[in-house]
Amino acid sequence: MIVRTLDECRNSERRIVSDNWESTRMLLKDDNMGFSFHITTIYEATETHIHYQNHLESVYCMSGEGEIEVVGGETYPIKPGTLYILDKHDEHYLRAYKYKEMVMACVFNPPITGAEVHDENGVYPLVD
């Protein structure tokens, strides 16, 4: 059994900070569960281009407000209780509204190793 708290993970190398977001990676590839689980905060008044070409992701909004715009498609509002699933490696823009940072629970398959950040194309590399 694996037991971890958000606080202990935040105070470790499992917390990754970027310009637009920070992510606490609570469950990673080396935990051998077949997926990874993160609590991610999207900073207020930001826009992040993301295109997970190597991963599928489901995201549940726990707090805050924003929107997700699928490139070449629709824009969907995000608020607490919203779940979105990137089941087609959807290229998108994630926006948190002003004064409304978003806190999200994220699940990735395949799992990430922990240190990944988006490259210039919004992609996480596939790491063995």
UniProtKB/Swiss-Prot annotation:
Superkingdom of the organism of origin: Bacteria
Record GO biological process: ectoine biosynthetic process
Record-stated family: Belongs to the ectoine synthase family.
Listed SUPFAM superfamilies: RmlC-like cupins (SSF51182)
Pfam families: Ectoine_synth (PF06339)
HAMAP family per the UniProt record, alphabetical: Ectoine_synth (MF_01255)
Taxonomic lineage: Bacteria, Pseudomonadati, Pseudomonadota, Gammaproteobacteria, Vibrionales
GO MF assignments: ectoine synthase activity
Keyword Lyase appears in the UniProt entry: yes
Enzyme class: lyase
Function (record text): Catalyzes the circularization of gamma-N-acetyl-alpha,gamma-diaminobutyric acid (ADABA) to ectoine (1,4,5,6-tetrahydro-2-methyl-4-pyrimidine carboxylic acid), which is an excellent osmoprotectant.
Reactions catalysed: (2S)-4-acetamido-2-aminobutanoate = L-ectoine + H2O
UniProt keyword Lyase present: yes
Pathway: Amine and polyamine biosynthesis; ectoine biosynthesis; L-ectoine from L-aspartate 4-semialdehyde: step 3/3
Keywords: Lyase
EC numbers, comma separated: 4.2.1.108
Protein name: L-ectoine synthase
